[in-house]
Curated annotation (Swiss-Prot):
PROSITE patterns: ACONITASE_1, ACONITASE_2. It is an enzyme of class 4 (lyase). The lineage of its organism: Bacteria, Pseudomonadati, Pseudomonadota, Alphaproteobacteria, Hyphomicrobiales. Binds 1 [4Fe-4S] cluster per subunit. Its cofactor is [4Fe-4S] cluster. Belongs to the aconitase/IPM isomerase family. LeuC type 1 subfamily. Gene3D superfamilies: Aconitase, domain 3. This is 3-isopropylmalate dehydratase large subunit. Pathway: Amino-acid biosynthesis; L-leucine biosynthesis; L-leucine from 3-methyl-2-oxobutanoate: step 2/4. It holds the Pfam family Aconitase.
Amino acid sequence: MSAPRTLYDKIWDDHLVDEQADGTCLLYIDRHLVHEVTSPQAFEGLRMSGRKVRAPEKTLAVVDHNVPTSPDRHLGIKNEESRIQVEQLAKNAAEFNVEYYSENDKRQGIVHIIGPEQGFTLPGMTIVCGDSHTSTHGAFGSLAHGIGTSEVEHVLATQTLIQKKAKNMLVQVDGQLPAGVTAKDIVLAIIGEIGTAGGTGYVIEYAGEAIRSLSMEGRMTICNMSIEGGARAGLIAPDEITFEYIKGKPRAPKGEALEQAIAYWKTLKSDEGAHFDRVVKLNAAELPPIVSWGSSPEDVVSVQGIVPNPDEIQDETKRASKWRALEYMGLKPGTPMTDINIDRVFIGSCTNGRIEDLRAVANVVEGKTVASTVNAMIVPGSGLVKEQAEAEGLDKIFKAAGFDWREPGCSMCLAMNDDRLKPGERCASTSNRNFEGRQGFKGRTHLVSPAMAAAAAIAGHFVDIREWN
């Protein structure tokens, strides 16, 4: 009888083509997502070597990072480098026979939102993209992670990837989430617990009652930020919630093929007694709404907490780093988080740009008005999310409250398009990174859930969503 295996072990074993004595492995790749920023050199490499894309049907391309999200984006992209990258992806996709969603296609959106929407992302698959947040797709019980541009070329040419196997980590989140606490708060709490290097060398499996109770949107939020915890990938075993989400998606199996697929997908779970190299446990019932205070995703506290004092940190290097973060963020130790005023609010990104996130925002802001001191924007994660939100009348709620309702794209998550912070501006953001300059030169980012961001937009400062009315 074979030894018990983790979910990661099973997917790895199913895709192992070859293993060398030093542990170097060749893995088969089921799905390859491509965007405009990390693919131009890869396609040029194919062109120069006279190669074709080995499996165009397993490759999907979309523009997301550079595209404007303003209503007039049909007028074109102002920045020359961004425009060239977008134009080049369209040309490369046509030349190499890869399906492509342009900015004028309603299926266009952030790469990690459109994959699941289209049924391109399925349980048990290996999925790669030249983007660190590819871990999002692990919410379906797939092994998904980012790759570099040279690896993008390798996958395009061979449909394989050279890898070494990571270690297994289990993050067990039991208990029931309190009202007002979301998947975003769970993952920020996890990163606060293990640190941004805590997952280095691991693939994380998320399990427990709180994880099981999440929708697919919530699970994608969790897996999306695995990389911020240092992990190679994050995954959640598929279940009935997963199967229901997949049913009816354009590229998902249908009929008997779907039933056969579900029978296989039900085997995709860690065996009882499977070995994890590290286990981390959290009690969801004790989690508060969380706000980041520094320039790392591990710099988090309860919304009812205060800005911490770095002098209480023993490690000299870390202490200096946290003082630098406070200086950059313009904050002082001891400041209550609810006393921090904000200038901007960004709701969107591959972390929190889905329909469930937008519904949560609408519930908070309906009948209210954005503070006069705040500029707030909502960017749907895809054209289909935008279409659904408008069908439900959410856009009317947002506009009536004073939010800017935008076109789909990565937007202000990263300063690679027109949406960015000005120096010194402070933003409540539903995105995944609060690094220095991430949202714009000298911009200050606080990571929060969609509901927390929405409430901050109305109040003009951070508030405890649990006390919101």
